[in-house]
């Protein structure tokens, strides 16, 4: 008698077998004969159905974003200081809005800063955290 018999092991079907076990056994028995019909086709159907389900969800996502981002009215733009310099038809400029001049002016302003004399300061570490010193 060979060490590994050619007959496959099957559990004895008893009355205590549930419907799920019977269906699983029938599925596993038919799967090698019809792999595309029993595995590939359901997989493709799930992918296609998922795309139909997710399409409205992504549309909803972009609609919510569009509701948040809206075009400013002229009055709101004036309140933010986005239109017109001071004195132009009574429009006031927002003092917090930074207006940068031309590039040359910005270059000279940055060059005037003293970048050579600075000191590195260490940040206070949490207890037990290594500070990186050797």
From Swiss-Prot:
Keyword field: Membrane, Mitochondrion, Mitochondrion inner membrane, Transit peptide, Transmembrane, Transmembrane helix
Transmembrane segments: 35-55
Protein's cellular compartments: Mitochondrion inner membrane
Pfam families: COX16 (PF14138)
GO BP terms: mitochondrial cytochrome c oxidase assembly
InterPro entries: Cyt_c_Oxase_assmbl_COX16
This protein's GO CC annotations: mitochondrial inner membrane
Keyword Protein biosynthesis: no
Membrane topology designation: Single-pass membrane protein
Protein origin, superkingdom: Eukaryota
Transit peptide: 1-12
Keyword Transmembrane helix: yes
Entry's family note: Belongs to the COX16 family.
Task performed by this protein: Required for the assembly of the mitochondrial respiratory chain complex IV (CIV), also known as cytochrome c oxidase. May participate in merging the COX1 and COX2 assembly lines.
Protein's UniProt name: Cytochrome c oxidase assembly protein cox16, mitochondrial
Organism expressing this protein natively: Emericella nidulans (strain FGSC A4 / ATCC 38163 / CBS 112.46 / NRRL 194 / M139)
Designated gene of the protein: cox16
């Amino acid at each position: 008698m060979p060490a590994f018999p050619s007959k496959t092991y099957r559990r004895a079907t008893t009355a205590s077998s549930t419907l799920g076990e019977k269906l699983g056994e029938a599925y596993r028995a038919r799967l090698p004969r019809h792999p595309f019909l029993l595995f590939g086709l359901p997989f493709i159907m799930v992918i296609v159905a998922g795309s139909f389900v997710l399409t409205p969800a992504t549309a909803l996502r972009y609609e919510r974003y569009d509701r948040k981002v809206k075009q400013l009215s002229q009055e709101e733009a004036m309140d933010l200081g986005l239109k017109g310099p001071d004195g132009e038809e009574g429009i006031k400029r927002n003092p917090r809005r930074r207006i940068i001049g031309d590039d040359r002016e910005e270059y000279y302003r940055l060059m005037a800063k003293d970048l050579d004399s600075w000191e590195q300061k260490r940040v206070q570490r949490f207890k037990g955290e290594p500070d990186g010193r050797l």
